[in-house]
Amino acid sequence: MRPAAITTSQRPARRTRSLCRDLECALPDATYVLRGTKNLRDTVLEALESGAEVLFYVTEAKGNPARLHVIDLGEIPPRLRLSFWLGGVKLQRELFGNRVDLSGDLVITTSKRPVSGHMKVAESLSEVLGVEFVPRAGSLEDVLEEALADVLLVVEGHPRHLGTLTFYRRTEKVGPSLFYRDFRTKDERMKL
């Protein structure tokens, strides 16, 4: 996996900060870059100094996480590669009870019967993060055995949103879960 950094908008609310800390624990080799009063340019420079190649930038609206932007720092100038409009999040403490530090190799997969949109999201995330994408045909155990991984990021459907991104340790859902309503790449857009 490419090294990642995670940051927020300036003066984030507690829930947004908690989501960023959960993402730091869920993504192997990720670091949290404290934004404070710095502008985004200075934050990108600090992320580059820490060795990050990908930046997860979480913005908020009304005290809740609203958007997740994935910026590729390996390109000059850094470019926005993916953007998710969030409809809600479930933190690790809400799913599992406490914060869990996930370590090991990350693999991205989908639900058993994915729609084309979920495949596109999984492939795009896999490309940006530099991790393996394994289409799911059977159970989560089959994906883990095929990829020899410990951490799964599962892209699946949701009745009220376009989809969800959920982190698993082996076959146990530990979170965070991000419910997205809109997904954009540099070339296309998928909306609910």
UniProtKB/Swiss-Prot annotation:
Instruction: Respond yes or no to whether keyword Nucleotide-binding is given for this record.
Output: no
Q: Which GO terms describe its biological process?
A: rRNA processing
In terms of InterPro entries, this protein maps to: Brix (IPR007109), Brix_dom_Rbsml_bgen_prot (IPR023548)
Q: Give the domain of life.
A: Archaea
Decide whether keyword RNA-binding is in the record.
Answer: no
What range(s) does the Brix domain occupy? 2-191
Q: Which UniProt keywords apply?
A: Ribosome biogenesis
Give any GO molecular function from the UniProt entry.
Answer: rRNA binding
> Function of this protein?
Probably involved in the biogenesis of the ribosome.
Q: What is this protein called?
A: Probable Brix domain-containing ribosomal biogenesis protein
